[in-house]
């Protein structure tokens, strides 16, 4: 596997700090946030300096019951080619469920949800990975995710599941050591056992990220400093194999450039500590490495069984339907609140005017709206539906100015074409909003 070195997740909010950071050999950018024909100047400058850029996808849903969407695969391939990337990465997760396969409404999670570690789910995942590999111009690596909930009646450990996936498909692995720590706290899984079961030579690179613990639950926030136990797991991994690359992820609550540099240096120190204590202990590399699948394929009946199970879980999380048998109700409640909170955050970024218009009332109003109203059409549609809900159901105590602004916002964006593309009209509306607040 090509050596990448030490890297950091590129985000627009820290673009300047990343460019100025010494010793950064590569960066990773969220694929869905990039437009191939209009790449950010910061990424272009990094590329000109010889810094490798890897697109990191979050929306394929390779662990879902449906086959990967051709349009999403084409978009990921286009970004890899535009960036000259040596590989692309995605997640072992499902992000949507329902639809034609299960004859039920389509539901979007808005986040990465765990795949059951069963033979059925593994068959589906392997086939989906092969579909993706055939559509992509560069190698694919897939990431283990953090989980707040456990599926009942799982048949494989995480190490076994990942080993078989790599063995049957030849796919590379992106190992997130922060997610191993998350699963240790939330699911009682031993990170050392997981590492011992991994095909270490299949590792493409490693993620490191921060989080926090609340009421015995670890939240993989990507908004807090990297915890010592996560660095210890990284050192353990590095004692078993020299990872081709290690990357710091930070998505929210960005610290100063100096603090980011300190976190990157702590990662380097952990890797060096691990290499000094190298043991070389891990599972043997998959014997084929070519993707010769020794398992059975995923027929429609297998996909339907998995689809029904995933739809039932997702519906309980985002639509308030009963908790499926065998799941921990308390943990599902934590996961449901986390999904709703993330949804509120993303809608607030997609439609930044709404938190401004509603002020402190935005978040509680959105969480109340999302409690039993699943997202079905993406975040922009969700923002429109939320405002329509507020206008329809709110008692009117926001004040006439707030309701007027919400109504204008909704009318401006609800049609196929904005009501007015004239700069003068937009300026007049913006001026009126300012005057209303005086």
UniProtKB/Swiss-Prot annotation:
Which family, according to the similarity comment? In the N-terminal section; belongs to the UPF0276 family.
Q: Which organism is it from?
A: Streptomyces coelicolor (strain ATCC BAA-471 / A3(2) / M145)
- UniProt cross-references to SUPFAM superfamilies, sorted A to Z: Xylose isomerase-like
Q: Note the InterPro entries from the entry.
A: MbnB/TglH/ChrH, Xyl_isomerase-like_sf
- Residue ranges of the region described as Unknown: 274-438
Residue ranges for the region (UPF0276) are 1-273
Pfam families reported in the protein's UniProt record? MbnB_TglH_ChrH (PF05114)
Matching NCBIfam families: PRK05409.1
Q: What is this protein called?
A: UPF0276 protein SCO6045
Highest taxon of source: Bacteria
């Amino acid at each position: 596997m090509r050596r990448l070195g030490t890297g950091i997740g590129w985000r627009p909010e820290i673009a300047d700090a990343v460019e100025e950071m010494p010793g950064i050999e590569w960066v990773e950018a969220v694929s869905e946030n990039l437009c191939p024909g209009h790449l950010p100047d910061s990424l272009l400058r990094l590329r000109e300096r010889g810094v490798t850029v890897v697109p990191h996808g979050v929306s394929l849903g390779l662990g879902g019951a449906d086959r990967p969407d051709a349009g999403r695969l084409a978009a990921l391939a286009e970004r890899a080619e535009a960036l000259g990337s040596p590989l692309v990465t995605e997640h072992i997760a499902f992000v949507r469920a329902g639809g034609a396969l299960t004859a039920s409404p389509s539901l979007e999670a808005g986040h990465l949800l765990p795949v059951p570690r069963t033979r059925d789910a593994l068959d589906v995942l392997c086939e989906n990975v092969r579909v993706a590999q055939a559509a992509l111009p560069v190698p694919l690596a897939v990431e283990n995710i953090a989980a707040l909930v456990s599926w009942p009646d799982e048949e494989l450990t995480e190490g076994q599941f990942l080993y078989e996936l790599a063995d049957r498909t030849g796919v590379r692995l992106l190992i997130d050591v922060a997610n191993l720590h998350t699963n240790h706290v939330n699911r009682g899984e031993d990170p050392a056992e997981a590492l011992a079961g991994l095909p270490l030579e299949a590792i493409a690179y490693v993620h490191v990220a921060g989080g926090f613990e609340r009421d015995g639950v670890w939240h993989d926030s990507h908004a807090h400093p990297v915890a010592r136990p996560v660095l210890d797991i990284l050192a353990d991994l590095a004692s078993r194999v020299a990872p081709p690359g290690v990357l710091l992820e930070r998505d929210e609550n960005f610290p100063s450039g100096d603090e980011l540099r300190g976190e990157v240096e702590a990662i380097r120190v952990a890797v060096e500590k691990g290499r000094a204590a190298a043991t070389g202990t891990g599972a043997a590399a998959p014997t084929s490495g070519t993707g010769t699948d020794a398992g059975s394929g995923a027929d429609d009946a297998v996909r339907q069984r998995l689809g029904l199970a995933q739809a039932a879980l997702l519906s309980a999380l985002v639509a308030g339907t009963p908790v499926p048998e065998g799941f921990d109700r308390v943990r599902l409640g934590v996961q449901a609140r986390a999904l709703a909170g993330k949804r509120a955050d993303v809608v607030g970024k997609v439609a930044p005017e709404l938190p401004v218009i509603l002020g402190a009332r935005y978040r509680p109003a959105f969480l109340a709206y999302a409690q039993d109203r699943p997202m079905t059409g993406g975040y922009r549609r969700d923002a429109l539906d939320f405002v329509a809900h507020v206008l329809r159901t709110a008692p009117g105590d926001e004040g006439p100015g707030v309701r007027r602004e919400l109504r204008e916002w909704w009318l401006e964006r609800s049609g196929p074409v904005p009501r007015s593309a004239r700069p003068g009209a937009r300026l007049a509306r913006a001026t009126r909003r300012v005057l209303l607040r005086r």
